[in-house]
């Protein structure tokens, strides 16, 4: 059985006002927003692959992934459409565990999903205990509407960077814009700097 640890985030002692990025409003609900139809991927057909810039790769089945050490991060999430949800509870695997399985010197990574969605990220933003591959939300398996069976969780960036239905990470030497980034969204997406669209500082 996989071990459990709480992750580096916990319930913050800061006031809710201090935790709300500019231009955001708090919500108790969990809105569903997607770029296209919702894929339904059975866990017996699910796999996750990390590929280096040289083509070397490491893959995990569902059983192998859920047997890895598990963390339970409690984090605030912020959508580019201006809602924020505080103290969301997840369970999954630190991306440090998965990315350490391949040797890479690349500075960038592209997250790739089962529906063809992609999003680009600096390598530094998915390592150092700040990002996860999660499969449970609030104590229950993650539903397809919210990215199940597994999605990325990168809470310090706008939530479009936390790719739903994710199937892998591909390291790249050059920065390769993803789906929303090519459509005009900001390349990085820091909610505290309101980096919603291309051209925002």
Kindly give the residue locations of the regions a language model identified:
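Structured, non-membrane catalytic/scaffold regions adjacent to prosthetic-group chemistry
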Residues: 2-201
């Amino acid at each position: 059985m996989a071990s459990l640890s709480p992750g580096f985030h916990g319930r913050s002692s800061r006031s809710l006002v201090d935790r709300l990025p500019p231009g955001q409003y708090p919500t108790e609900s969990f809105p569903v927003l997607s770029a296209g139809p919702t894929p339904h991927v059975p866990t017996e057909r699910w796999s996750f692959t990390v590929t280096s810039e040289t083509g070397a790769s490491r893959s995990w089945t569902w059983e192998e992934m859920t047997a890895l050490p598990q963390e339970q991060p409690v984090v605030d999430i912020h959508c580019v459409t201006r809602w924020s949800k505080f103290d969301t509870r997840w369970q999954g695997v630190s991306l440090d565990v998965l990315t350490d399985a391949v040797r890479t010197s690349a500075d960038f990574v592209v997250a790739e999903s089962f529906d063809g969605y992609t999003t680009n990220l600096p390598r530094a933003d998915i390592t150092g205990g700040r990002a996860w591959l999660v499969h449970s939300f609030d104590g229950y398996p993650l539903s397809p509407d919210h990215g199940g069976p597994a999605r990325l969780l990168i809470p310090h960036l706008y939530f479009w960077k936390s790719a739903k239905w994710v199937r892998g990470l591909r390291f790249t030497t050059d920065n390769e814009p993803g789906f929303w980034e090519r459509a005009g969204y900001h390349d990085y997406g820091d909610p505290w700097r309101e980096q919603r669209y291309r051209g925002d500082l």
